[in-house]
């Protein structure tokens, strides 16, 4: 039996433009997990208990991207195991390979999310878990210390009360430039966050110059990074760079997550073997080959993978 990833690659290879969609639903929105009571259960009524998942699009797109990234890069599962644990990575890949979509969502919810990050309630014989919210809260912030960075700064004024400072961040949030300059705005924003620089010290009454070191990854360059783009306007995103330099490492564009404002719904786009695909778990046909970017959707995040060192 072929794995899900092998089936997707085969469908791309055998595509002759007549049908640009994958043959079956992949990671559909929501999910129902049925628990059967054991034989020793005496007073369990009913014998079947359901776990119902709602509004799972806040993790679905990223789970799909994670699956593609781990399959496209043979060393990444081992690297990610250092952050997530080998048991989680192996279980995640097995569940996706075998089309166990509801179970893989429960794996993420129970293994990586805090209970206060989602709503749950018991209704009749069902436990309902509702993931309505922001995908960066439900996924990106739960990537352990994978993308943790640190930047040190020193003020030239010896009397500055905060002469030495450290800024540590667990996620990568880049903000649009306040003044719109010429050039690639995303790359400029990334450089603003990562590159060394000298600025006036903001400490009240200081007047010194503050020198910022290059921002570095706390645990080495991660296999992939997620750039939070939810504060950017569409007009600022006319050009998306296909590669970025982050802390002396080159990263290549692998995918993105997208937001439908009218439906308050997330989807994802990613590439496999040079072919771009759009995944939307809410649709009946939810995985299609792209011949142009999806329309009327806002960019929520950009996902880059670390380039292979040659």
From Swiss-Prot:
Alphabetical GO biological process terms: cAMP-mediated signaling; G protein-coupled dopamine receptor signaling pathway; gene expression; memory; neurogenesis; NMDA selective glutamate receptor signaling pathway
The protein's assembly and partners: Interacts with DRD1.
Protein name: Dopamine receptor-interacting protein 1
InterPro entries: C14orf28-like
Organism: Homo sapiens (Human)
Coiled coil residues, start to end: none
Functional summary from the UniProt entry: Could be a regulator of the dopamine receptor signaling pathway.
């Amino acid at each position: 039996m072929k794995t899900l990833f092998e089936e997707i690659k085969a469908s791309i290879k055998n595509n002759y433009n007549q049908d640009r969609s994958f043959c079956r639903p992949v990671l559909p929105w929501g999910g129902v997990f049925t628990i059967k009571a054991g034989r020793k259960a005496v007073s369990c009524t009913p014998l079947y208990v359901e776990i119902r998942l709602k509004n799972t699009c806040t993790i679905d797109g990223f789970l799909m991207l994670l699956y593609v990234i781990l399959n496209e890069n043979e060393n990444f599962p081992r690297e990610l195991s250092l952050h997530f644990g080998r048991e989680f990575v192996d279980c995640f890949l097995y569940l996706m390979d075998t089309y166990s979509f509801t179970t893989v969502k429960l794996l993420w919810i129970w293994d990586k999310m805090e209970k206060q990050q989602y709503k749950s309630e018991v209704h009749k014989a069902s436990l309902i878990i509702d993931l309505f919210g922001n995908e960066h809260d439900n996924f990106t912030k739960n990537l352990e210390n994978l993308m943790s960075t640190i930047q040190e700064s020193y003020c030239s004024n010896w009397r500055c009360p905060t002469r030495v400072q450290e800024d540590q961040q667990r996620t990568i949030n880049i903000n649009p430039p306040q003044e719109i300059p010429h050039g690639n705005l995303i790359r400029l924003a990334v450089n603003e966050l990562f590159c060394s620089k000298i600025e006036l010290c903001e400490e009240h009454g200081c007047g010194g110059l503050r020198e910022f070191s290059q921002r570095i990854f706390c645990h080495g360059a991660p296999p992939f990074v997620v750039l939070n783009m939810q504060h950017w306007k569409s007009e600022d995103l006319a050009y998306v760079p296909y590669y970025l330099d982050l802390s002396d490492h080159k990263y290549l564009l692998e995918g993105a997550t997208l937001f439908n404002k009218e439906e308050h719904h997330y989807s994802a786009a990613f590439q496999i073997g040079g072919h771009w695909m759009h995944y939307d778990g809410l649709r009946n046909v939810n995985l299609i080959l792209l011949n142009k970017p999806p329309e009327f959707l806002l960019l929520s995040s950009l996902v880059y993978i670390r380039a292979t060192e040659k």
